A protein has these predicted regions:
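A residue-level marker of the well-folded mature domains of exported/periplasmic proteins
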Residues: 2-9, 18, 23-311
Length: 311
């Protein structure tokens, strides 16, 4: 009888050991190489990625490149040497980073990009919005607003990020629509370089140089926050601003009537889908090469559902 109990106990211990081993084997380590961790859009990507990693029992390590392409290259070297199971990339320089993406692929480390689309290469998937199409959608919204609220005439300035391929696509899409309207006069583009302080200075220069400017299009979160702050600092509360990516500042400006509309992405979903894609890939599965995430134009009419995320 005692031997029977011992055999049962040994079997239970062995089963538990197998279960523990299986759980340990399931957990993977993924590296998220971020653009920066100061802008809420990027931190939301990180939050979504962490949520998916927690669900899958994976470990997520995050590297903040602080807007530096060379830092991202160095991070690739480190994570390849550490033999992580996969890399998620929010690229500062999509073209320049491809050497590192190829090195990771050669080392057997799959790469999934988020936000900025990479050139053709060995990356396994890209998760992003259609930036040019969304720019066109905002352009159509802007033209309709000008017709209904400004007698069909407006002067337009752009606070962009000329170092960002995806923000150039947003600008291109927007201008392809607004440029075809004879009532809209474009006065110029200033470069905020996707850095909030620089976007503020660029926005101030745009407003100072164009005292009759009455509308601004901002192509990203730093550009939008910079444009809002620039208009406030110069007492230009009549200027109507259209842009990308909600923030606490953008919400307050929507309430004040300064910001008319914002293209809102789902960065948390982008990060979430990236980890899920890597988990599928490293388990022998397949994913779509391009995974699109939808956008929504946010105005006073539908902003309330977003408030909780920016308190």
């Amino acid at each position: 009888m005692r031997n029977h109990h011992l055999r049962r106990l040994a079997g239970t211990v062995a089963a538990l050991a197998l279960m523990a081993g299986a759980a340990q084997a399931k957990g993977k380590t993924f590296a998220l190489i971020q653009y920066n961790q100061q802008v809420s859009f990027f931190t939301d990507i990180t939050k979504g990625a962490q949520k998916a990693a927690d669900e899958e029992g994976d470990k997520l390590v995050v590297f903040d490149a602080n807007n530096s392409a060379s830092a991202q290259d160095n991070a690739f070297d480190t994570y390849i040497q550490q033999k992580v199971d996969g890399i998620i990339l929010v690229a500062v320089d999509p073209d320049g980073i491809m050497g590192s993406v190829k090195a990771a692929d050669k080392a057997g480390v799959p790469v999934v990009s988020v936000d900025a689309a990479l050139p053709p290469g060995p990356q396994k998937a890209g998760i992003t919005v259609d930036n040019e199409a969304a720019g066109k959608e905002m352009g159509a919204f802007y033209v309709d607003y000008v017709k209904k609220n400004m007698d069909g005439k407006a002067s337009l300035g752009v606070v962009g990020a000329l170092n960002s391929n995806l923000q150039l696509l947003r600008q291109k899409g927007f201008e392809s629509v607004t440029g075809a309207d004879a009532g809209i006069t474009k006065v110029g583009v200033v470069d905020g370089r996707n850095i909030q302080d620089q976007a503020l200075a660029a926005g101030e220069n745009l407003l100072t140089g164009n005292p009759k400017l009455d509308t601004i299009y901002a192509t990203g979160e730093p550009a939008l926050i910079g444009a809002i702050a620039a208009a406030a600092s110069q007492g230009r509360d009549k200027v109507k601003i259209f842009g990308w990516d909600l923030s606490a500042q953008a919400l307050a400006a929507i309430d004040a009537g300064t910001v008319v509309a914002v293209v809102q992405q789902a960065p948390d979903q982008e990060g979430y889908k990236a980890v899920k894609a890597l988990d599928t890939l490293t388990s022998g599965g397949k994913v779509e090469a391009t995974i699109k995430v939808p956008v929504e134009i946010v105005t006073k009419a539908n902003v309330d559902k977003y408030r909780a995320a920016y308190k």
